[in-house]
Amino acid sequence: MTNNRRRALLPALLLCSLLSATPQLSAQDSFVLEAVDGQRWMKGNMHTHSLWSDGDDFPENLAKWYRDKGYQFLVFTDHNTLLQKERWLNLAKRKGSDKALQRLREQWPAEWIELRGTGDTEEVRLKTFDEVFAKLAVPQEYLLIQGEEITDRFGKLPVHMCATNTAELLPPTGGESITDVIQQNINAATARRERTGVRTLVHLNHPNFGYAITAEQLMKVVGENFFELYNGHPGVHNSGDEKHAGTERMWDIMNSFRLQTLQLPLMYGLGTDDGHNYFETASGKGAQPGRGWVVVLARTLEPDAIVEALEAGRFYSSSGVSLQAVRFNGSSLKVEVQAEADVQYQIQFIGTDRGFDPESRTASDKPEEADTLTRVYSDQIGKVYATVAGPVAEYRITGKELYIRAVVTSSKRHPNPSEAGEFERAWVQPIAINNP
């Protein structure tokens, strides 16, 4: 058997059980996403960097920041590394580490901090995940999860993926194309999950970082059902530009083709902050924490429960708006906002009709750019079915929809946006609508 054929068969063999283990929400389901009957909304960040890679603060400082800000869970996702084993950081060689050490001394007792050497050879020991967990996690109140940013590339193009809930390092696999790089990393993570039984969720990070990944490249990947719809890093181009589709447009393109043509599950859209710069305070500058997150509905605050809820679509993504409930009864989708005083809300219901026009054209007249840009499709894809002013809105399903999703936009400006002019938003995950 050739390597290429083995690669083609591996996803089907390994992923079929996972794709059916936690079914996605669809029109066959009637469901209510609300904090009742022992279920809780849990706010978390799934993309975080510390001094273990290219973040500029210590992991215990980060964990304390998110806990103090009311988060229920945090995933550490340093580049190609886990917070394990003994590691010492040379302070003189790491720019800005003096600020981090000062904060460490302000927030923790002297016996917590381990130093050795003097002058240019002075080093501080980085605390491991287990040490930080023991210090800061609170059962059923605040959870820390070990993760990793699998940092791969194809040529000069970055291909980054976050693994949530992994105790073993997932080395980048490489691949023969952008799609193949993503697929091979998914295959490796799936094989690890099958072997260990640990629920590891892998999501594709910031597709517009370096404008590396198109909707067409990502939509084909088997087993990748999550990507970053909103990433708080100011250099990842969530909104795209005149040639590059924004991530929300990519989302609709991918789900339209995955459902109608590729027979793949829905792609869910995550909100993250991709925190790196914990001492930057100027609005819109640096990759600061707290710009975007997910809110997951689960009964228990444990890694497996969080991953299971995400895989089932029992969550929403946010850059500031909080939801009270999402209700679906098979014939209508209702969204209820946890409204703030003196703030107005607009709720849009968005989707694509079944039988949509799949034709497209290149986004550039330059032949060399044709395959590097998401193609231009008709407005039938990702069209707005209804727009409602107010904190509560309901859309009645007609039966023509392939899927339906909702986005809530607030009149309140994001206090620290990744892109200028952002309003606070919340994104309800898409629901596949079956044939009537």
Task: Annotate each language-model stretch with its function.
Residues 1-11:
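Bacterial N-terminal signal peptides that target proteins for export
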Residues 11-21:
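Bacterial N-terminal signal peptides
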Residues 21-27:
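Boundary at the C-terminal end of the N-terminal hydrophobic targeting segment
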Residues 28-38, 53, 59-63, 258-269, ...:
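C-terminal functional module detector
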Residues 31-216, 220, 231-249, 264-267, ...:
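A metal-dependent hydrolase metal-coordination microenvironment
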Residues 73, 226, 403-405:
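Residues at the N-termini of beta-strands
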Residues 217-236, 288-289, 293-305:
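Structural recognition of alpha->loop->beta junctions
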